[in-house]
């Protein structure tokens, strides 16, 4: 078990500990539960779906990287597939505050990058900030997405974001988590192809500036992130953050990164290179390259 989970795990009910122990035994537990695992945990612990999600929130929050605020937020995105995806907030010392990943963004990006097609609910241990409410409004689940908070009745995103501005106001039909493939040809080595594949998945209906990042760890594991734009622009999640989020949720540290590649168009309206390189260098990675989509 990764050390970050030990305190939260010790506070779980005994029957839930017994069921979770073999799942968490892997140091690189992927911070997600399959639909089958969720069903097993519900039956073993005698909890319904909502109660189980609340019980597991401390494990999600344990994934937080909060060197600046020391305020850990955890979230669990519940996919329409039945799979659950952990998320937690991330802060990057030496970079800028704008590079921060919020817990809800973390869980949602996690689900999206693992191929989830839509979300039924998000469970989070603190009320979503306005930034996250706007981010969630880009999803194909729309304002019907259920939000679950401890000690409160469940509500929909519509309740948390009244008179919402979103993609429909800009006549955007393809939403975040809808299947997309922009068709860029895969070239180069394995890491380069992974970055291009991530760029092909980008949600970028506002700038039409696709981008993807691939990070290679010292053990050969590769994590990718795809660009996810938002109708309100500022809640947009850059591709590097998506990749760093997956890497961290899987129990890796920034020091494990040995190479990074950004895939983007050289003549795009928005360019990720400078911000991507600056953030990676702040985290200690200097082996950074760029491949141009064409």
Curated annotation (Swiss-Prot):
Its EC number is 3.5.4.5. Substrate binds at residues 89-91. Zn(2+) binds at residues 102, 129, 132. Its cofactor is Zn(2+). One of its GO terms (molecular function) is cytidine deaminase activity. It catalyses: cytidine + H2O + H(+) = uridine + NH4(+); 2'-deoxycytidine + H2O + H(+) = 2'-deoxyuridine + NH4(+). Residues 48-168, 186-294 form the CMP/dCMP-type deaminase domain. GO terms for biological process: cytidine deamination. It is an enzyme of class 3 (hydrolase). Homodimer. NCBIfam families: cyt_deam_dimer, PRK09027.1. Belongs to the cytidine and deoxycytidylate deaminase family. This is Cytidine deaminase. The lineage of its organism: Bacteria, Pseudomonadati, Pseudomonadota, Gammaproteobacteria, Enterobacterales. The gene is cdd.
